[in-house]
Amino acid sequence: ADNRRPIWNLAHMVNAVAQIPSFLDLGANALEADVTFKGSVPTYTYHGTPCDFGRDCIRWEYFNVFLKTLKEYTTPGNAKYRDGFILFVLDLKTGSLSNDQVRPAGENVAKELLQNYWNNGNNGGRAYVVLSLPDIGHYEFVRGFKEVLKKEGHEDLLEKVGYDFSGPYLPSLPTLDATHEAYKKAGVDGHIWLSDGLTNFSPLGDMARLKEAIKSRDSANGFINKIYYWSVDKVSTTKAALDVGVDGIMTNHPNVLIGVLKENGYNDKYRLATYDDNPWETFKN
């Protein structure tokens, strides 16, 4: 058996359809897109300024078009199909929502995915989806999302969905306990990703929270399944994150991780995740 840790190589801030093949060609097996809302309606994949150093912050697409394009890349038999593209993270910019818009926004994202990505359950895209929310207070989003899939008779698609409550960032990131509580309120037990990190121009810091999260993931009663670190663009940072035990790297340069995974000392411990790797399964250190 292959006992190496499977690694998700997440291309950061992929918001225009033309960027999808470019990042996959660099070796990404997963993509992250930013979802911007108008009211409670997910309307664009768009980040805006400021963003990571060296990146064009204003590339965008209509959300429905973006999802249909993701579907093409992840549906076997499609001319654009890529076997290695196995997961995408939707970075949901729910900070713009009022409290009473949070649940409807979750319902709307579910409807969009159901129609434009999953093709109403009829041979849609096969990639796994992580819903990343910037505020642990927005757990109603997840409840609304799940409710729609149940109502529409597609509860089975929740097998393909994971969750990442990543903030708020200010005044400081929530504790792991507070994050765990939010998941309970969301009715989520399992399929949990945790992200930790900084913009690519921040000094790296001591990875203290990352190490704490990994310790929690690996503990007997840990609630986290996978941990990814962002934005990791240098060989040295990539190695440091792998050494600590992350499951994923979010990067502006997916080719960097591909290079590291070929190196002695890394190629025997880590490998690029494939579709057969379950993203909701904990791989302990």
From Swiss-Prot:
Binds 1 Mg(2+) ion per subunit. Its main location: secreted. It comes from the Eukaryota. Expressed by the venom gland. InterPro entries: PLC-like_Pdiesterase_TIM-brl. SUPFAM superfamilies: PLC-like phosphodiesterases. The active site is at H12, H47 (nucleophile). Disulfide bonds join C51-C57. Mg(2+) binds at E32, D34, D91. Its EC number is 4.6.1.-. One of its GO terms (biological process) is lipid catabolic process. Belongs to the arthropod phospholipase D family. Class I subfamily. Dermonecrotic toxins cleave the phosphodiester linkage between the phosphate and headgroup of certain phospholipids (sphingolipid and lysolipid substrates), forming an alcohol (often choline) and a cyclic phosphate. This toxin acts on sphingomyelin (SM) with high activity (56.8 U/mg). It may also act on ceramide phosphoethanolamine (CPE), lysophosphatidylcholine (LPC) and lysophosphatidylethanolamine (LPE), but not on lysophosphatidylserine (LPS), and lysophosphatidylglycerol (LPG). It acts by transphosphatidylation, releasing exclusively cyclic phosphate products as second products. This is Dermonecrotic toxin LlSicTox-alphaIII1ii. It comes from Loxosceles laeta.
